[in-house]
Amino acid sequence: MAKIERKRIPNFTEPEDLTHQFIKMKDGRRMHVATVGSGEAIVFVHGWPEFWLTWMPLANKLKDDFKCIMPCLYGFGLSDKPNALRDDLNAEFHANDILQLVEKTCEKPPVLVGHDIGSHVLQCCATQGARKGSSLYPAGLIFFNCPTPSVGEEWISHGHINEIWYQSFHLTQLAVDLVGCSSETIKIYLEHFLRHWSFRKEAYEPFLSKLLETFSTKEAIYGGFSWYKSNNKARLKTIAGEKKPYNPKIKIPSSVLWGRHDPILRSNWASYLHENFENITIEFAEESGHFVHFEQPELAADFVRTKLNKWTQESG
């Protein structure tokens, strides 16, 4: 059981040595990437509604020992964005972008860290990398929540269907128009999820103004909502029990630190992880909800550092 961390406001401060760059994808799109620190590379993959800055409280605690690479997925933050809802921006699409980023910025296989959308992307990076025989196949995977195909009808059982209404709402142009109607509607909508999904309700507040700024355009709304439109077929197949555990299982060393109080990706779903991963350890953040990385950044940093040190020793 992970230790309980005292309440403190997370540090979203951008350090002086933080750098920003744009990486061009093979099709010409630009991916924005923020980088800080030096040492072994860690690539962080965010969720919705987030962008690279969501990782800063964690990166501030890791940057003295690790090179923290924090991209904005296509459609998010400062990366290029679509000008309409799209149905092809699924986990495979984003995983391909992350693998391109790794090839361009990492000298050896990095550890990937993710949650929410990022957890789907990391699983795809593992399966895609295995199929393609990538020379930069991830060295390890760290998750702060990790839904898998095995979750199945749990998505709609035990009242959970009431939590996932937004996933269908985001499929529509109506959602884009209503949410993006004004700066106030954007704030009301996004803050609802930040507050509802957090156990530490104050943790997101230092992040809020910059988050709202990045979601202030219709293109940014399209970008985020396109994930849900693109993932919808896979989501419905999962709920119907038509998606089976990975075969073969993901073999990369993996670890999960799941927020005990996550209301949308429930921590009891961790029981399905061993059906999909050959080598995975599971711990729980007892005072976190959905956003472990900024609700309990010290705990998250200790977790990342411990796992990387362990994997390095085992591989050496």
Model-identified regions with their sequence ranges:
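Short, hydrophobic alpha-helical segments
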Residues: 304-316
